[in-house]
């Protein structure tokens, strides 16, 4: 499960992380600010260190990370129907 939260404390995101961990699912968090609970609860956390409330840079970097991950999957898991 990949979860994204700038504050790292979004209740729905933390609930999803805890649910996934209870089911034995590996979790990856993308957090910003101070990382919040997401940084502590995720199996792997990618933290974008920004000042609290600095959503713009946090969301921009999260978008770049998601784009890179998408490019990786497209390059490594090509489907003949594409």
Task: Cite the ranges covered by each PLM segment.
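Glycine-rich phosphate-binding loops that contact phosphosugars or nucleotide phosphates
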Residues: 1-81
């Amino acid at each position: 499960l990949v979860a994204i939260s700038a504050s790292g404390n979004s209740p729905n995101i933390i609930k999803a992380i805890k649910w996934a961990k209870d089911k034995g699912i590996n979790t990856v968090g993308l957090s910003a600010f101070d990382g919040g609970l997401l940084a502590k609860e995720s199996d792997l956390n990618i933290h974008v260190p920004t000042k609290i409330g600095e959503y713009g840079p946090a969301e921009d970097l999260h978008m770049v990370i998601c784009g890179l991950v998408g490019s990786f999957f497209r390059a490594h898991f090509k489907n003949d129907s594409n």
